[in-house]
């Protein structure tokens, strides 16, 4: 082609480049790459991918291009025989009349572009590319082909650093004129920058006739010179070695490039480059000689044959197989790369020696891991994942935080001494990194993994690739970690597979602590890059990802803190290179926080802590928190405290601790008390005594032994560290010592350890003054030293059953007992302390075990006298012997009718009355006690509860044994709170743990805030409330009737009662409107209140469930709901709240039960809810039986978990265990009787009554799960609502034993039924103005119509199943829609006449209307007539003055719309009550309004 081509003229525009090319090539112009004068380079789209097209336009004289085409064919054919080529010739060419085209595959990157692209090439990568470039030239020269135009643009690179030499210039002239730069510019200066890579001998003198043929063949030495220039530019960070003028001067000997090469630090590289660019061509070596001579000097030994052969095997494999094979031979790769290091560098005494590995050995090793059995390889990849990473670094084996401070108990003392109060920090979190872990070759493996990680199809192989990157990161430098590996790891945080996201999270947290040196531009990598990318993980759909994030948040926090400290150091020093990783790691921890004194530094630290605090709060209290997530977060709570500092730990970590204990998960509570000791040291002594000790105190009564032991170990650690003051220590000893008789040896040993540590902390004198009198009753003898664990263990009395331990435990928490104990401690006569303690314990033990003793004695009076005389022996030895005997008695209580309560404590009857258990023993009702005389469907309590009377402070325990919490009883609130305050410290108390009797533990967790000064007031107010109920407070003549005793338990299973506690006796709402809540857009079908009355929820037809803060009902003018839960388009039919918890259960019209928890934070005195955090623990159950019709709490002593009974539209009745998420049992109602529209269950859980949509009421025996009685309501109509009837104390015991229920059905009436016989006792009728023809009284006189359970097959199917209702459903009769029972048989009702009435059972004439529309000209002058007919009592509401005109429903609605008192304007659907400063009535209506009355 020669100089003739140089005379061509300017050609057409680029739009016509492909105009002359045949359409069969299917090329589409995409981009113009180069506008050189000789060839135009364009990028085109082809069916097989992107291609580069070099275009030569023909102009002027015609030139024969066949010779150049022959050379292209030769080059292509020769290189086809290469097995693993580093050359890439032109693949296609085409000549047309106007142009010639050269086509090859497009490569994304060439060496020129790669040198200026992040991440910049590391030193070993540059050596690897130089090595491959020499290999490429060697392959060319071995085939007698010279390139002719080697430059950076013609060196192509793949993403995994495989090099190709392309664009062979067989058509360019070999020699060009020395004194005419036009030819150089035309052929070789494509960028116009005058860079020259040509050998000096390719320039000739232009004077006269030339002595050199321009088309003479190229020589290998010319390519070697160009290779030297490219390698020099590679190691000079893209700076060219020669420009044209410099090369010509160098040819004349007027330029020395060695000065420019001095910028290359490696002398071996400089020597090799200088040898390649010698002026004498003969002095230059061949490419093969350079490869051999500079092995070990420039090129590492493992480059050839090991690494090159490995890459040759990887090239043809897909990404998945590359990762799989890399995983299989990773250890061999690491071993080979570390071989050329000296013993000092790798941390051993002598250099590592190994057998040389040639190419065949490498291929054999690779083949052993390749596709002989690809499935086995992939399976081995999964099985051996741990061997890869954990066999590399001992540091990662031994410690979860290998390069960060791991907070242990041994280090806490030293750490506390480093605290800087001004900056609230504890020093730098980084630990030194060992220098012998550097292996530069790992960068090449990391680059290969990064190149294919996005194209891996199998998720487990993507995970393996991330783990391999984590392994490689141990051996590469900081810049490669941040610039090369980190972006790929962060990108995989959004991978669709959970295991990949987890692996990316773990790898991220393991890589970042390794970084010790980074440029100032990366100082804000955490706030601007890391944390935003992690923001979606707390709401990840997979729990495993959230657990992984929670377990690593402490690592992230400490690492971000270390980065922040280093950025301050960089700003102080000013020059990055002056700080290396060794200086950072050896900086004294006490000096590092001095940089945080700057205002900017403090602001950044506060912002960082705020960011981490938000993440922690989202994980702990967010909508997707689980016990496993919380447990993972607790594992590193010490590191989080280290990060937050003392002030932030108090301000942020302490308030969220109750959220951990509000969880039911036993393992979570166990881990909490295992790790809380770290929090104690960081928050300080005052916070421990005021906030954390009450938590530990309540953990001692937990049913899980691991929780108790961990709490005791925490106390022991605090004692050994002298962390507790004397007063706090004595208070904890008060709480702990009853556990000395715990049946588990594990717990007893933990108690002994704590007592011994306390003794050692107090000293010998105080130990015998304070500890010995308390524990003496539990020891057979006093040991020589209380501080000796072995001595205490050898002196312990035999253990007792767990029930007895909890009774003793609760007895010791009685304020009276604690007052006696403290009075004994601080008495002026120390010699009497021991004996007073013995007397005190005798009295307590006797009271606690009197029932057990009586149950095991015979019925004779002599036996009682023996017990009483034995308990009153004055001799100390006799007392000890009695205590030993009582503690050893096996607990097999059997009820005995003749047993009575022996009362030695003058206030003991009151205590029994408080707990609701006095009646079975003093009322003489043998039907409670005698097994053979127990009625089938009575209100009797569990036999186990009846034979084990409680102690005074056992209110919450006994309420739970009945299947209810003490907070479920409104009039028990103040008493139960005061009795549960076990410590005299006036700080928030946590009622946590599981008090239980027998086999029915009930767990509840609630923070109780009460001032100490109010305890006596609360007790006295509780006594006065019980006296108001008619309960005598005398000690001997207490006469409590059965209905009083059972009334607390009556809350169980009653639909409205289980949702809203039974209001106070004598409570008479006046109808004063307190609040009007109008957020629902449709009917509010049901209301449920929490056990502590702090909030209530409402379920509506508008597909929402709203949470309302009842504590602000009387305070806020603009009252709004706090939280809203959406039912996904279905209507909320019914709702209830599980007792002593914040869990809400909602039944929807689409047959789905929704259960969720309301997360809130309580602070200050009075347990005031400060913030509602959100709705958590969402659980859904699709019953697949149509709409949920009725829903209520069901709790019985024989059941361990919270149960929910519900009925469905398809006639199903189910009992759902909310813990196991399974149905305990399922019953089916008869379809001909209609679906079950209402349910009511007994307090003891032995029976329940169902009411159907066709007026059939059925009594079910739950012991055998069969219907035992069924009767038809006098009118065939739906049973709207049912509730239990709590009769007054004046009614005889025989009447109270009957299952009496109120039934709202029919037209404007409520009836009282005895479900045992199906007989009606009372009918309450509302005045019916629109239809004066009331139902005849005759139908109530008739005996109940028994429903035959056997179907009559002769009966017409249409009448049996009422098929006509499918065409036209029967209209609902106007009447009562909601019931709320009151003590003494009183009742609140609400219905379609928009009125709420209070019915008085004892004095029906005192019944009255609480609220309702005031009718014009009528007034609220209703009176209530009482009539009795054949045993049925009728209470009829009538007007004192007859109406002048007939009153219609439209007139009632018009009157309601103009009512000044604010009555309901539509049917009253639900009633509930809450007890705050005063009791309030809550009502909801069909128009979506909720009203609160007082």
From Swiss-Prot:
GO terms for cellular component:
Cul4-RING E3 ubiquitin ligase complex; cytoplasm; endosome membrane; Golgi apparatus; phosphatidylinositol 3-kinase complex
Q: Which GO terms describe its molecular function?
A: ATP binding; protein serine kinase activity; protein serine/threonine kinase activity
This protein's record includes keyword Repeat: yes
Q: How is it modified after translation?
A: Autophosphorylated.
What keywords are assigned to this protein? ATP-binding, Autophagy, Cytoplasm, Endosome, Golgi apparatus, Kinase, Lipoprotein, Membrane, Myristate, Nucleotide-binding, Phosphoprotein, Protein transport, Repeat, Serine/threonine-protein kinase, Transferase, Transport, WD repeat
- Annotated region Disordered: the residues are 859-903, 1037-1064
Cite the repeat ranges for HEAT.
383-421, 480-517, 524-562, 610-646, 648-685, 687-724, 727-764
Active site residues of this protein: 149 (proton acceptor)
Catalysed reactions listed for this entry: L-seryl-[protein] + ATP = O-phospho-L-seryl-[protein] + ADP + H(+); L-threonyl-[protein] + ATP = O-phospho-L-threonyl-[protein] + ADP + H(+)
Top-level EC class: transferase
Q: What name goes with this protein?
A: Serine/threonine-protein kinase VPS15
Subcellular location field: Cytoplasm; Golgi apparatus, trans-Golgi network membrane; Endosome membrane
Tissue expression notes: Mainly expressed in anthers, pollen grains and pollen tubes, and, to a lower extent, in other tissues and organs including seedlings, roots, stems, leaves, flowers, pitils and siliques.
Q: Name one GO biological process term.
A: pollen germination
Self-association state and partner proteins as the record states: Interacts with VPS34. Component of a complex made of VPS38/USL1 and PI3K main subunits such as VPS15, ATG6/VPS30 and VPS34.
Q: Which residues bind ATP?
A: 33-41, 54
Report domain Protein kinase positions: 27-307
Q: Which InterPro entries match?
A: ARM-like, ARM-type_fold, HEAT_type_2, Kinase-like_dom_sf, Prot_kinase_dom, Ser/Thr_kinase_AS, Vps15-like, VPS15-like_hel
Q: What superkingdom does the record give?
A: Eukaryota
- What's this protein's family per the entry? Belongs to the protein kinase superfamily. Ser/Thr protein kinase family.
- PANTHER family named in the record: PHOSPHOINOSITIDE 3-KINASE REGULATORY SUBUNIT 4
Q: What happens when the gene is disrupted?
A: Reduced male gametophyte transmission. Abnormal pollen grains with unusual large vacuoles. Reduced pollen germination rescued by phosphatidylinositol 3-phosphate (PI3P) treatment.
Bilayer disposition of the protein: Lipid-anchor
């Amino acid at each position: 082609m020669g100089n003739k081509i140089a005379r061509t003229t300017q050609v057409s525009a680029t739009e016509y480049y492909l105009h002359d090319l045949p359409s069969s090539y299917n090329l589409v112009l995409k981009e113009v790459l180069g506008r050189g004068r000789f060839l135009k380079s364009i990028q085109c789209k082809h069916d097989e991918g992107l291609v580069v097209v070099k275009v030569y336009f023909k102009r002027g004289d015609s030139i024969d291009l066949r010779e150049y085409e022959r050379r292209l064919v030769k080059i292509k054919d020769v290189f086809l025989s290469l097995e693993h080529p580093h050359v890439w010739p032109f693949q296609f060419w085409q000549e047309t009349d106007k142009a010639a085209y050269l086509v090859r595959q497009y490569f994304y990157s060439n060496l020129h572009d790669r040198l200026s692209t992040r991440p910049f090439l590391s030193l070993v990568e540059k050596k690897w590319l130089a090595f491959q470039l020499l290999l490429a030239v060697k392959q060319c020269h071995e085939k007698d082909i010279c390139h002719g135009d080697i430059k950076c643009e013609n060196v192509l690179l793949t993403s995994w650093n495989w090099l190709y030499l392309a664009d062979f210039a067989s058509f360019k002239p070999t020699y060009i004129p020395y004194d005419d730069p036009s030819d150089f510019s035309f052929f070789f200066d494509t960028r116009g920058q005058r860079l020259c890579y040509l050998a000096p001998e390719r320039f000739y003198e232009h004077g006269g006739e030339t002595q050199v043929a321009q088309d003479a063949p190229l020589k290998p030495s010319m390519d070697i010179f160009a290779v030297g220039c490219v390698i020099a530019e590679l190691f000079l960070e893209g700076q060219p070695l020669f420009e044209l003028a410099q090369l010509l001067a160098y040819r004349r000997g007027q330029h020395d490039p060695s000065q420019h090469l001095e910028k290359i630090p490696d002398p071996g590289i400089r020597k090799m480059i200088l040898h390649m660019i010698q002026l004498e061509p003969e002095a230059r070596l061949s490419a093969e000689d350079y490869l051999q001579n500079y092995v070990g000097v420039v090129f590492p030994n493992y480059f050839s044959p090991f690494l090159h052969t490995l890459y040759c095997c990887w090239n043809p494999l897909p990404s998945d197989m590359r990762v799989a094979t890399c995983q299989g031979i990773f250890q061999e790769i690491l071993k080979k790369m570390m071989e050329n290091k000296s013993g000092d560098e790798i941390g051993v005494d002598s250099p590592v020696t190994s057998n040389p590995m040639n190419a065949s050995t490498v291929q054999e090793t690779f083949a052993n891991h390749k596709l002989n059995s690809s499935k086995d390889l992939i399976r081995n990849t999964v099985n051996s994942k741990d061997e890869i990473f954990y066999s590399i670094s001992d540091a990662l084996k031994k410690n979860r935080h290998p390069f960060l401070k791991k907070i242990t108990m041994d280090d806490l003392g030293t750490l506390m001494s480093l605290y800087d109060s001004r900056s609230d920090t504890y020093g730098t979190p980084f630990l030194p990194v060992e220098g012998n872990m550097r292996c530069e070759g790992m960068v090449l493996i990391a680059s290969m993994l990064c190149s294919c990680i996005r194209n891996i199809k199998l998720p487990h192989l993507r995970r393996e690739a991330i783990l391999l990157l984590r392994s490689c990161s141990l051996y590469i430098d900081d810049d490669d970690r941040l610039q090369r590996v980190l972006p790929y790891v962060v990108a995989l945080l959004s991978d669709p597979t959970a295991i990949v996201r987890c692996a990316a999270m773990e790898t991220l947290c393991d890589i970042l602590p390794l970084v010790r040196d980074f440029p100032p531009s990366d100082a804000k990598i955490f706030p601007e890059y890391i944390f935003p990318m992690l923001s979606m993980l707390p709401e990840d759909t997979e729990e495993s990802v959230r657990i992984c994030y929670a377990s690593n948040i402490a690592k992230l926090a400490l690492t971000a803190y270390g980065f922040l400290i280093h950025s301050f150091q960089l700003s102080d020093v000013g020059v990055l290179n002056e700080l290396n990783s060794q200086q950072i790691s050896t900086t004294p921890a006490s000096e590092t926080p001095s940089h945080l004194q700057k205002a900017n530094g403090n602001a950044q630290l506060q912002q960082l802590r705020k960011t981490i605090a938000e993440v922690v709060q989202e994980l702990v209290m967010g909508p997707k928190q689980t016990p496993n997530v919380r447990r993972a977060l607790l594992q590193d709570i010490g590191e989080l405290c280290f990060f937050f500092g003392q002030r932030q730990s108090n301000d942020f970590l302490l308030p969220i601790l109750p959220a951990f204990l509000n969880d039911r998960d036993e393992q979570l509570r166990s881990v909490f008390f295992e790790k809380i000791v770290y929090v104690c040291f960081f928050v300080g002594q005052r916070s421990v005594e005021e906030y954390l000790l009450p938590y530990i105190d309540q953990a001692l009564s937990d049913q899980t032994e691991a929780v108790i032991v961990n709490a005791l170990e925490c106390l022991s650690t605090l004692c050994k560290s002298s962390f507790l003051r004397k007063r706090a220590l004595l208070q904890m000893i008060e709480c702990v010592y009853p556990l000395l008789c715990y049946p588990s040896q594990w717990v007893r040993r933990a108690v002994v350890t704590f007592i011994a540590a306390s003794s050692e902390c107090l000293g010998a004198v105080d130990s015998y003054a304070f500890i010995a009198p308390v524990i003496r009753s539990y020891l057979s003898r006093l040991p020589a030293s209380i501080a000796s664990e072995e001595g205490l263990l050898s002196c312990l009395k035999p253990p007792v059953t767990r029930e007895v331990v909890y009774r003793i435990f609760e007895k010791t928490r009685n304020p009276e007992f604690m007052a006696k104990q403290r009075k004994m401690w601080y008495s002026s006569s120390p010699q009497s302390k021991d004996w007073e303690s013995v007397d005190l314990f005798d009295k307590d033990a006797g009271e606690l075990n009197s029932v057990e003793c009586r149950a095991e004695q015979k019925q004779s009076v002599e036996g009682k006298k023996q017990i009483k005389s034995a308990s009153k022996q004055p001799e100390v030895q006799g007392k000890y012997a009695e205590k030993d005997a009582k503690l050893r008695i096996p607990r097999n209580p059997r009820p005995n009718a003749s047993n009575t309560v022996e009362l030695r404590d003058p206030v003991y009857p009151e205590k029994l009355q408080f707990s609701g258990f006095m009646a079975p023993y003093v009322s003489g009702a043998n039907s409670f006690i005698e097994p053979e005389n127990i009625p089938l469907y009575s209100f009797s309590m569990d036999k186990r509860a009846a034979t084990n009377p409680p102690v005074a402070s056992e209110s919450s325990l006994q309420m739970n044994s009945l299947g209810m919490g003490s907070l479920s009883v409104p009039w028990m609130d103040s008493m139960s709170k005061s009795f549960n305050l076990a410590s005299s410290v006036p700080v928030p108390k946590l009622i946590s743990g599981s008090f239980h009797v027998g086999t029915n533990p009930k767990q509840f967790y609630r923070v109780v805030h009460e001032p100490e000064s109010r305890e006596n007031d609360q007790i006295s107010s509780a006594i006065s409330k019980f006296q108001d109920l008619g309960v005598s407070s005398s000690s001997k003549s207490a006469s409590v009737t059965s209905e009083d005793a059972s009334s607390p338990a009556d809350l169980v299973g009653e639909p409205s009662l289980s949702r809203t506690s039974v209001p106070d006796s004598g409570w008479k709402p006046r109808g004063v409107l307190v609040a009007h809540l109008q957020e629902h857009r449709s009917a509010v079908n049901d209301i449920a209140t929490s056990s502590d009355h702090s909030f209530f929820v409402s379920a509506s037809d508008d597909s929402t469930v709203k949470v309302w803060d009842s504590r602000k009902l009387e305070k806020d003018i603009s009252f709004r709901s706090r939280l809203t839960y959406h039912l996904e388009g279905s209507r909320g039919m019914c709702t209830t709240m599980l007792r002593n918890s914040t869990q809400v259960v909602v039944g929807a019209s689409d047959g789905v039960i929704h259960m969720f928890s309301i997360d809130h934070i309580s602070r200050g005195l009075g347990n005031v809810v400060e913030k509602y955090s959100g709705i958590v623990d969402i659980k859904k159950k699709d019953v697949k039986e149509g709409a949920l019709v009725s829903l209520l709490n069901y709790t019985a002593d024989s059941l361990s978990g919270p149960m929910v009974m519900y009925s469905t539209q398809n006639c199903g009745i189910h009992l759902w265990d909310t813990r196991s998420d399974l149905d305990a049992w399922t019953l089916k109602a008869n379809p001909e009787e209609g679906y079950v529209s209402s349910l009511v269950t007994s307090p003891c859980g032995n029976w329940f009554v169902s009411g159907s949509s066709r007026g059939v009421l059925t009594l079910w025996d739950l012991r055998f799960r069969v219907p035992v009685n069924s009767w038809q309501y006098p009118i065939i109509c739906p049973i709207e609502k049912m509730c239990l009837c709590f009769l007054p104390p004046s009614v005889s015991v025989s009447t109270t034993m009957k299952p009496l229920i109120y039934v709202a059905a029919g037209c404007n009436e409520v009836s009282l039924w005895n479900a045992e016989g199906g007989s009606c006792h009372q009918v309450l009728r509302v005045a019916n103005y629109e239809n004066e023809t009331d139902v005849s009284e005759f139908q109530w006189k008739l005996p109940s119509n028994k429903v035959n359970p056997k179907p009559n097959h002769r009966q017409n199917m249409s009448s049996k199943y009422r098929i006509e209702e499918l065409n036209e459903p029967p209209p609902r009769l106007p009447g009562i829609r909601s019931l709320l029972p009151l003590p003494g048989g009183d009742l609140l009702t609400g219905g379609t006449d928009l009125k709420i009435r209070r019915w008085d059972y004892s004095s029906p004439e005192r019944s009255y209307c609480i609220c309702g529309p005031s009718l014009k000209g009528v007034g609220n002058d209703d009176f209530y007539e009482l009539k009795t007919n054949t045993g049925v009592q009728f209470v009829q509401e009538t007007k004192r003055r007859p109406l002048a005109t007939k009153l219609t429903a439209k007139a009632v609605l018009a009157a309601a719309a103009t009512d000044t008192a604010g009555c309901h304007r539509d049917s009253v659907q639900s009633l509930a009550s809450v007890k705050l400063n005063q009791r309030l009535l809550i009502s909801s209506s069909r128009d979506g309004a909720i009203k609160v009355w007082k």
